[in-house]
Amino acid sequence: MAAIVLTTINARYIHASLGLRRVYANLGELRAQARIEEFCLTDRVADMAEQILALQPAIVGIGVYIWNAAEVRSLVGLLKRVAPGVTIVLGGPEVSHLPLRVDFGEADYLVRGEGEIVFGELCRGLLAGRPPAERVLAAEPPAVDALAQPYPFYTDQDLAHRLVYVEAARGCPFQCEFCLSALDHRVRPFALK
């Protein structure tokens, strides 16, 4: 059982989500009540929902990317039909920029921007019975050096059999037309440790 389930649908099994681990790392005392569950595009949405709901979460946070937006929409719809009392929070690049390419109207909350800190604050409020008035929460970019690092939360299995991403900076110095990172205008490097 986990009060908070962090999940996403990776493009392939070999991918290990940096975003989920970054959010998990910054949950602080809520980490003891949280769990990461990753899926890939080849998994059936019904199987994903069953695995998530078996953990009896109060809150499900889902990372949304260009490759999984349609599947996430289906997953959210199924979760809401089967367990309408579960709070669904979406974050990630596909919900951070307007206009939304996919309708996520069934989700309870959308976290736009860099949501590591805001997601934890939202969970604290929800678990204490204090939901926010707004459905869309705008996350201000945190100071990168104030963020807890996600790397301790990769498992030995991840390290041996999956791709482990390293984030050296936030933002991108390039302005590629096809990429959402082009909308971020500032590069903020992490300190080398």
Question: Can you annotate each of these PLM segments?
Answer:
Residues M1-V5:
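Extreme N-terminal starter segment of soluble prokaryotic enzymes
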Residues L6, N10-R12:
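Solvent-exposed loop and edge beta-strand segments that line ligand/cofactor-binding
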Residues T8, G19, V23-N26, L30-A146:
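Glycine-rich beta-alpha loop elements in corrinoid/cobalamin-binding modules
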Residues Y13, W67, H97, G120, ...:
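Tryptophan-centric aromatic hotspots in well-structured domains and transmembrane helices
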Residues Y13-G19:
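Short N-terminal binding/cap micro-motifs at the start of the first secondary-structure element
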Residues S17, I66, G113, A169, ...:
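Short, solvent-exposed loop/helix junctions and linker helices
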Residues A148-K193:
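Radical SAM [4Fe-4S] cluster-binding motif and immediate context
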